[in-house]
């Protein structure tokens, strides 16, 4: 089994592992690397099957997490965006000795809308999966557009995400389909009460995929951490609002209140 693409940079002493979302790759973090490099040693990872960690093998959430753990520092902060947030949360739940702190960005322990739980309708995710077979490229572009919908800088943010996708090899349809299945089927809510490490949860106030209404519900399920809602942001707050995002992240890492 080949190693994942893993790029380490930054002059800081704290290790920070950054995990991207569905359809993308580690290049999505490049715009905030300069703001974080002084405080952190950054580990930019292409998840299995994505970008330069190519391959057609679909992975379960546990398998994907194990692949990242195999190359991760012995102890680090883990930051995951969207699908990457599920991987980071899985690591924190089942390997807490390896995770000094958890940061999730526009992520949810359960992405699918359920009774009294806001999220993405299951039929919408099914629809994207069926579209992957018919129009691979267009389906990815549609999903990227959904991630920025509502933000003041939506058009600019969509262009930025699209450039990230095009900068590296596209994931296979099998890998993308498996990723959508993870978003549709994963439910980590029952395990959240066992988390006993610092946890910062970023949400975009205008996010249509992970609605801000989920924030107090996650707060009620977890004994630790807190939620931070960024006004004017959609599903990619680190792209649309890099300054408040990086400031809050650095304060969290320093152990200060955010």
Curated annotation (Swiss-Prot):
Pathway: Cofactor biosynthesis; biotin biosynthesis. The active site is at 82 (nucleophile), 207, 235. GO terms for molecular function: pimelyl-[acyl-carrier protein] methyl ester esterase activity. Substrate binds at residues 22, 82-83, 143-147, 235. Pfam families: Abhydrolase_1 (PF00561). GO terms for biological process: biotin biosynthetic process. PANTHER family: AB HYDROLASE SUPERFAMILY PROTEIN YCLE (PTHR43798:SF31), MONOACYLGLYCEROL LIPASE (PTHR43798). Monomer. This is Pimeloyl-[acyl-carrier protein] methyl ester esterase. It comes from Edwardsiella ictaluri (strain 93-146).
């Amino acid at each position: 089994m080949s190693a994942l693409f893993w790029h380490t940079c930054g002059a800081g002493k704290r290790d920070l592992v950054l995990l991207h979302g569905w359809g993308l790759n580690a290049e999505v973090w490049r715009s905030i690397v300069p703001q974080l490099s002084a405080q952190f040693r950054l580990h930019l990872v292409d998840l299995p099957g994505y970008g330069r960690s190519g391959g057609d093998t679909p992975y379960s959430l546990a398998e994907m997490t194990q692949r990242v753990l195999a190359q991760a520092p012995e102890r680090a902060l883990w930051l995951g965006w969207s699908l990457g947030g599920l991987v980071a949360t899985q690591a924190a739940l089942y390997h807490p000795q390896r995770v000094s702190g958890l940061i999730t960005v526009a992520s949810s322990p359960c992405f699918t809308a359920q009774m009294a739980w806001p999220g993405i309708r299951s039929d919408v995710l099914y629809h994207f999966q069926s579209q992957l077979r018919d129009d691979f490229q267009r389906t990815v572009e549609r999903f990227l557009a959904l991630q920025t919908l509502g933000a003041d800088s939506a058009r600019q943010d969509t262009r930025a995400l699209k450039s990230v996708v095009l900068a590296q090899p596209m994931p296979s349809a099998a890998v993308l389909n498996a990723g959508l299945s993870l978003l549709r089927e994963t439910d980590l809510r029952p395990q959240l009460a066992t988390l006993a490490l610092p946890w910062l949860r970023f949400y975009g106030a205008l996010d249509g995929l992970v609605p801000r209404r989920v924030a107090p519900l996650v707060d009620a399920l977890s004994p630790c951490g807190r939620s931070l809602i960024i006004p004017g942001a959609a599903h990619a707050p680190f792209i649309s609002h890099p300054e408040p995002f990086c400031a809050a992240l650095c304060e969290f890492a320093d152990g200060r209140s955010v």
